Amino acid sequence: MPEMPEVETVRRTLIPLIKGKTIEKVILWYPKIVATDHEKFLSELPGKKIIDIDRYAKYLLIRLSDNLTIVSHLRMEGKYHLTTSDAPKDKHDHVEFIFTDGTALRYNDVRKFGRMQLILTGTERQTTGIGKLGYEPNSSEFTSEYLVNGLKRKKKNIKNTLLDQSVVAGLGNIYVDEVLWRTKIHPLSQANKIPAEKVMELHDQINQIITEAIKLQGTTVHSFLNANGQVGGFQSKLQVYGHVGEPCPVCGTKFEKIKVNGRGTTFCPHCQVIYK
């Protein structure tokens, strides 16, 4: 699933491609991608101009004229690409926004898990899943105190806690494994047993790794591509994720992999301490 750095990369690459364009027509080849009223989606978007593209956590917020916003969640494999309106359709293209200049933005999703909603701008927290999210890394609200206090109430393991979007918005499996290895915290550590000073270190590393990943335009492990069809660059910097059986760069112990609530989790059994 695209995590915060990947969605931010999509946002940054989409802006120069579609900002300022006016929608002429919308085609829904797979209507279930749109979670709100399909007919309204088709009838209200023609004539609307792309004003800007924002993001919160893993959600893209495509700002339109007349105070409307398309909220888009890519889920597992959603992608956007710009083409011409007469270009052959790929079998995994499910939504098309045709612009007045003859170009078209297509949403492609192999698994069909992605979702879009058409809402009034400013109602994101009231009408979408954004309202259930915690603060995202590198925001002014995501302080070390916020994370320390948040973990005090969590008795589950730290891996699941960091994947909980109501605690930290935007993190996924890849970056959680990397952060826990950097901070030498075992993924099965009980969240509220981790010392405050260690949680502060965790906070700093979350911010750091997200910054690094955004700078390198995200991580492509399976299928992630930005809006220009390019892969990310952070996969070459991964130290633990995808390296099961290889030696830890710090101690030489072979990385091990376990399942934590169904999620593959790679860690160093020597460096990473279990807090219980």
Curated annotation (Swiss-Prot):
Annotated transmembrane regions: none
Catalyzed reactions: Hydrolysis of DNA containing ring-opened 7-methylguanine residues, releasing 2,6-diamino-4-hydroxy-5-(N-methyl)formamidopyrimidine; 2'-deoxyribonucleotide-(2'-deoxyribose 5'-phosphate)-2'-deoxyribonucleotide-DNA = a 3'-end 2'-deoxyribonucleotide-(2,3-dehydro-2,3-deoxyribose 5'-phosphate)-DNA + a 5'-end 5'-phospho-2'-deoxyribonucleoside-DNA + H(+)
GO process annotations (BP): base-excision repair
Catalytic machinery residues: 2-3, 58, 263
The protein's required cofactors: Zn(2+)
Zinc finger intervals, FPG-type: 239-273
Entry's cofactor comment: Binds 1 zinc ion per subunit.
Keywords, alphabetical: DNA damage, DNA repair, DNA-binding, Glycosidase, Hydrolase, Lyase, Metal-binding, Multifunctional enzyme, Zinc, Zinc-finger
Gene Ontology MF term list: 8-oxo-7,8-dihydroguanine DNA N-glycosylase activity; class I DNA-(apurinic or apyrimidinic site) endonuclease activity; damaged DNA binding; zinc ion binding
Domain of life: Bacteria
Entries under Pfam families matching the protein: Fapy_DNA_glyco, H2TH, zf-FPG_IleRS
Binding site for DNA: 92, 111, 154
EC numbers, comma separated: 3.2.2.23, 4.2.99.18
SUPFAM superfamilies, A to Z: Glucocorticoid receptor-like (DNA-binding domain), N-terminal domain of MutM-like DNA repair proteins, S13-like H2TH domain
Quaternary structure (record): Monomer.
Recorded family membership: Belongs to the FPG family.
Function: Involved in base excision repair of DNA damaged by oxidation or by mutagenic agents. Acts as a DNA glycosylase that recognizes and removes damaged bases. Has a preference for oxidized purines, such as 7,8-dihydro-8-oxoguanine (8-oxoG). Has AP (apurinic/apyrimidinic) lyase activity and introduces nicks in the DNA strand. Cleaves the DNA backbone by beta-delta elimination to generate a single-strand break at the site of the removed base with both 3'- and 5'-phosphates.
Protein name (record): Formamidopyrimidine-DNA glycosylase
Organism listed in the record: Lactobacillus helveticus (strain DPC 4571)
